[in-house]
Design a protein with these regions (language model features):
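Acidic, Ser/Pro/Thr-rich low-complexity regulatory regions
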Residues: 1-106
Length: 106
C-alpha cells in the first residue's frame, strides 16, 4: 500500500493515540503496584528497586515504539498496536477507506 503525506500525518496521530494508551496502562499498573501492601519479606527498598526495574524495562519498550513514527515502520506500528488492542478499528475512522481496509483485514 502506498501512503500519501496526508495518510502519514493521520497515521502519526493514530500511532500517538495507541502509544499514549499503552503509557496510561503502564502508569496504572505501576501505580497499583506501588500502592499495594508490602509482602512479608518485602520493604520500601525492595519496592523501589522493582519500580526502577519496571521503569527501565518500560523505557526500552517505549523507545522501540517510537520507531513506529518512522515512515518505514508506520504500517508495522499500526498493525502491532491494533493486535495489542491499544488501537481499535474506530481509531482508523479518519483514514482513507483504502488505508482503513488494509489494516483491518490483517
Amino acid at each position: 500500500m502506498e501512503l500519501t503525506k496526508a495518510d502519514k500525518r493521520q497515521l502519526n496521530d493514530v500511532i500517538r493515540r495507541g502509544i499514549l494508551r499503552r503509557c496510561e496502562e503502564w502508569l496504572n499498573e505501576t501505580g497499583a503496584f506501588i500502592n499495594q501492601k508490602y509482602g512479608d519479606d518485602e520493604n520500601a527498598f525492595d519496592r523501589c528497586m522493582e519500580v526502577t526495574k519496571r521503569a527501565r524495562d518500560y523505557y526500552k519498550e517505549a523507545m522501540l515504539r517510537e520507531d513506529y513514527y518512522r515512515n518505514s515502520m508506520m504500517e508495522i506500528g499500526v498493525t502491532a498496536l491494533l493486535n495489542e488492542e491499544y488501537l481499535t478499528p474506530d481509531d482508523l475512522s479518519e483514514c482513507r477507506e483504502e488505508v482503513r481496509k488494509e489494516f483491518l483485514r490483517q
